[in-house]
Amino acid sequence: MKELQTYILLILLFCLPITSIGQINQSINKSKDSTIKVIIKDTSLTGRKIRSDQFYDTLKLKASKNKFTKAALDLILIQEPEKGLFIGEENIRKERYFDLYEGKTIRKIEIIKLDVFGPPLYDSSTTPFLTWAQNAGNKTHVKTRDLIIKNNLLFSEGDTIDPTQLIDNERLFRELDYIKDATIQVAEIPGNKNLVDVLVITKDLYSAGFYLDLWNYRSGSIEVYENNLAGIGHKIRGRWLIDTYESPSMGYAFNYKINNLGRTFIKSGIQYYKAFNTEKIEIKAFRSFFSYNTKWAGHVSFSQTSTLRDIKKIDTTLINVRLNYSTQDLWIARSLLLKTQNIKYANRTRLVIGARYINNKFYKGPEISERFNFDYHDNQILLGSIAFSRQKFYTSNLIYAFGKTEDIPVGLLAQIDIGFEKDEFFNRPYAGFILANGIYYPKIGYLNFRTELGGLYYDKKIEQGVVKFNAKTISNIHYLKNIKLRSFLNVNYTRGINRFPDEKIYFKSNNDIWGFNTNELYGLKKLSFNSELVAFTNLYMYNFRFVFFGFGDIGFIGPENKSVFRNNLYSGVGLGVRVRNENLVFKTFQIKFAFYPSVPSDMDPFYLLVSGESYLKHNYYDPQAPTTIDF
């Protein structure tokens, strides 16, 4: 009966956003090359805006009679801005706009930096009413320095206009942790058809913040951070952790990151963690294929870890073992642009060749053998890769963020990884394959799928093999009066092939059944379905927007030689709320409640989480560092 109730609720969650709820109001601009740019047009604010203003005016009039109530009201209420919350309809795509100036020489670059709390990026001529708290925020915030903005430009004065490069540059600005949005405009020079000026307009986030994570009533963490230290784009974070179940019960972590070293677009950082019998230090540097014409990418990292862990002995008894190990990781890749007849992916198609070396060394560890506790073997892995990639971006909003511009990748990645593992017990060749694709369907929404398979070859057979499949759909926006609805559906499948005896997979809280954490359910094969229906409301409080959601997850897990559907079904359903002010770097405040109709003995049927949540990220189709696929 419980499973039947769960099925009914899941069906409702899956079907509700797909049915015709209200009027679907979308503007889709099509160009001659059939490229589609998705624009969500918000027409539901007008009536509510009038009623909201009347309510606020009445409330403010009453509160103004008392100094204390007036000050308190200024802290929590502002008038909802007329523009800037949603992407407006454009007459032409930005790419077509930049095409008008292709090949012209850049005479001068001018930078304009808007206030954190102020006019929206796409209508900077307006002068909105600001509360005293917002004015204080603008005065205490250090805007990103001009030098840092110029360091993040892909072009310089004297260069010629490259439309694709300008599009990439806007996206790169939006990917920075301290920039809310950015736009690039081109201005003609009167009397000179060959010269233009470029205007770069940016809007910062308020870069200092903190968040509180409550895992349960006996454990949690507090983090403070500055994402744009002194306006130079450096990030510094400190975290204090407490868990009364552990001894010692308190710990801390520190992280320092530089986003762009001297205009090389190399990200570097150092992090240190010491808590709950674990100490780790890591130094790393990373450069991605950040633009269509980037030729070189790679990373290098060094880490040292010491930790206590409960590990099985060969006789299957558990023993608390001190692990002390180090890891060195080096990857380098070269990109070659390919010519294509597909206009949609012109200058967006490439072939990438890469190589990677990983060295894992254990100085202290558990009892091991050739086929036991493989994760604690000393090993060296050398991998090479060849990848075909094509990728471009559309802009939309109200997907993972609460109204700001989001870049949606579409494209294809096909990558082959081949290499060799030198283990302390054996030497084995490795082969793996990755295929990923992202598509936008105007009548349905966004579809992404990813397939991974790989394994090592030893003693005339494949061992430690794995097959993974993930499919994700994001629906178009549907309207229910003033509420905007969007649904997210996910399917995850994992199967192990000839894994070692002590290798098992478990349900993962974030990928399978949310909040479902147990050590009693495991296997070599699992399948899960996730559904979330998100309601974007027009409820604001001091620019904090409220988003409500409901979710339903089901999963199966079991042995390799048994159909996954013949295992017991486990499920979870729940509700939650997310709150965020997109002018701040504060993580999204989230309250999430779940109920599980059937649970193993080491779990409770109810779970409540209060936490800070970072934005989820879309799957990109850039070539990746070759790797052995995780099980």
Where are these regions (language model features)?
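Bacterial N-terminal signal peptides
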Residues: 9-17
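Immediate N-terminus of the mature polypeptide
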Residues: 2-4, 20-462, 473-631
